[in-house]
Amino acid sequence: MEPFWPRRSPHFLACRRAVRPFLSDREVVIGLSGGADSLALVAAARAEGQAVHAVVVDHQLQPGSDDVAREAARQARRLGARATVTQVRVRPGNLEANARTARYAALRAHNQPVWVAHTRDDQAETLLLQALRGNPGGMAPHQDGITRPFLSIRRADTLQACAELDLHPWHDPHNEDPDFQRVAVRTALEQIHGDPVEPLAQTAERIAADNALLTELAGPPTDDCAELAAQPGPLRRRRIAAWLIERDIRPTRASISMIEDMCTTWHGQGAVRVGGGLEVRRVGGRLALSVEA
């Protein structure tokens, strides 16, 4: 049965317009949580004729997560997408960071272009989250092998698009838990008078563009401490951050600073913990990542 695309659907139209610059002749993997953003992305891509493999990553962190995953896959198939469910194990510790690492590893494992459904609201939240970690920045539409077609539209568009399509998104209880840093930031933004999302998102986009230029000037990630030590500080720190990101590690101001010291003022420092049960050491003049001892 062909999917139903309503004639009068202004919010779904916004979603469809957002994906058009990113359409590919290849099948793309879309990370599908079952929430409104990712359901709307699958729907918009399919409405524009994009071949989609919707991958539902079940983190197994909540009771009934397997039922949620199966329902998300069912709705994706109704939209004309191929859909599979992948279960992952999330390491203990920083639940947000470790779940993200496991999720992206599962999406990349298919060796296809990967799309995720971050919106303009996510862009604003990410700017503040990264600023709190001492490394403010924004998300680019294409970054580290990930495509984000929805950075130009709002979360309200995806919610209303699902209503227009008679889709039934899952509302993750974790999105209401203030113990998660992103939820706390989101709640704080909602309490600010006016709409802070647009100016924050614009700032994030400018930073992302600046970062792209500086990253090009800095050169590719390297573990060579002598090469890093020879660079100006701003480029060196950016290169260290890129080296961590390449390994699915979120850089923080503290971790970058301590790794930088390993390169520039080496005196036998101990390992630097970088989260996820991992640490960085200097071995033979190079940075080495290993499991915490």
Which residues does each predicted region cover?
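Residue-level detector of well-ordered alpha-helical segments, enriched
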Residues: 123, 199, 235-239
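AMP-forming adenylation/ATP pyrophosphatase catalytic core
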Residues: 2-37, 53, 57-59, 88, ...
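Active-site-proximal catalytic alpha-helix in oxidoreductases
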Residues: 178-212
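PAPS/PAP-binding and catalytic site of the sulfotransferase fold
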Residues: 161, 185-192, 236-244
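Short, surface-exposed acidic
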Residues: 170-173, 194-201, 248-257
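Core alpha/beta nucleotide-donor-binding catalytic domains of modification enzymes
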Residues: 1-188
